[in-house]
UniProtKB/Swiss-Prot annotation:
Family: Belongs to the IWS1 family.
Function of the molecule: Transcription factor involved in RNA polymerase II transcription regulation. May function in both SPT15/TBP post-recruitment and recruitment steps of transcription.
Compositionally biased intervals (Basic and acidic residues): 1-16, 28-38, 70-89, 287-297
Region of interest called Disordered, as start-end residue ranges on this chain: 1-105, 277-297
Location relative to the cell: Nucleus
GO aspect biological process, one term: poly(A)+ mRNA export from nucleus
Name assigned to this protein: Transcription factor IWS1
InterPro entries: RNAPII_TF_IWS1, TFIIS/LEDGF_dom_sf, TFIIS_N
């Protein structure tokens, strides 16, 4: 070994001896932390510089930014608008809570009760106006309060979603007051009658509602009164039939209708009619003849004076019983070999046809 090599090895040894005491004084945890930081720095340097680390090319942020498409202002606004629209459309719907339903029912009840009070006040004002007109004789006083309020009443009664609320709050009682005859004996305005009856026809009225409101008596009056227009009378009669059917337990199906039948003897009836006519002729008095003249129409009376026959007038008769048919039902499609062959009528027709054929052949 040369002198130069000995001097270099001595220098390295001295350097190592100088560094060793410095490392021995360092805390082990501090030494570990520095080692981790050094490793992280080396890894980051290797990523940034291809000369360091594994030799892979480093990622350039500028190149990635340049590869993305640059959006113009119109496209960006359109995308923002589409995103907001999707957010609105796919937004979950808020479910109606029980509290909201209770508040809605309470609002509907208050609305119907206010209308009920308004109807009662309007009816009372019209009654007061008519009483004042009867007392003073002033024909200028006209009861118009109900007519003014009628459009609002019809609007509420025609709402299907308020039908149960109307019936539960007994608005039918106010309807009955409006339909009742006035103090002077006249009926309400025709427009009131027509509108209210049309509304009643669409409401699901039950027996308990009729008992509570007392509406049934007024509707029966309209079905029997001669002062009511024929169309309204028929509608009132229809309502009475519909309301009465569940009370008596009748079905609305015509097939379920029971028809009372009774055997009818024509010969017996004819003999009885002859006997009754003979007895009535003997017992008839002049007073009865005078009474019959009263019930005759002017046309029949004029025909009787001229000793001429009068055309019979149309009468409406009701029958309690339907006659029992004594004709055997024969199938319309019946052919040869059925019960039709054995009937006397068929035999006579067949003999006549055969006789005609023999005559033609001769």
């Amino acid at each position: 070994m040369s002198d130069t090599e000995r001097s270099l090895s001595a220098d390295k040894k001295s350097d190592t001896e100088l560094e060793t005491p410095a490392l021995s004084n360092v805390d082990p945890q501090e030494r570990t932390r520095k080692h981790i930081e050094a490793t992280a720095e080396s890894d980051s340097d290797a990523d940034l510089d291809p000369a360091l680390g594994n030799g892979l090319p480093a990622h350039d942020d500028d190149e990635e930014t340049g590869s993305r498409p640059v959006l113009d202002e119109a496209t960006r606004k359109r995308q923002d608008l589409e995103a907001r629209m999707d957010q609105i459309l796919h937004k979950p719907k808020k479910k109606r809570t029980r509290r909201d339903e209770d508040d809605l029912e309470q609002m509907q009840d208050e609305r119907i009760l206010r209308l009920k009070d308004e109807m009662n006040i309007a009816a009372q004002k019209d009654i007061d106006t008519l009483n004042e007109r009867l007392e003073t004789g002033d024909t200028k006083l006209v009861a118009m309060e109900k007519v003014k309020l009628l459009p609002k009443v019809v609007k509420v009664l025609s709402k299907v979603n308020l039908a149960d609320t109307i019936l539960d709050n007994n608005l039918l009682q106010s309807v009955r007051i409006w339909l009742e005859p006035l103090p002077d004996g006249s009926l309400p305005a025709f427009e009131i009658q027509k509108s209210l009856f049309a509304a009643l026809d669409n409401l699901p009225i039950k027996t308990e509602h009729l008992k509570e409101s007392g509406l049934g008596r007024v509707v029966i009056f309209y079905s029997k009164s001669k002062r009511v227009e024929q169309k309204l009378a028929r509608l009132a009669d229809k309502l009475v039939a519909e309301w009465t059917r569940p009370i008596i337990g009748a079905s609305d199906n015509y097939r379920d209708k029971r028809v009372l039948k009774l055997e009818f003897d024509v010969e017996k009836h004819r003999k009885k009619t002859i006997l009754d006519t003979a007895k009535s002729k003997k017992k008839r008095s002049k007073r009865m003849e005078v009474d019959e003249e009263k019930y005759k129409s002017s046309y029949e009376q004029a025909a009787a004076r001229r000793n001429r026959a009068a055309a019979p007038a149309q009468t409406t008769t009701d029958y309690k019983y339907a006659p029992i048919s004594n004709i055997d039902a024969v199938n319309r499609n019946a052919g040869v070999g059925t019960s039709v062959d054995s009937s006397e009528l068929y035999k006579r027709l067949n003999s006549k046809l055969s006789g005609n054929k023999h005559k033609r052949s001769k």
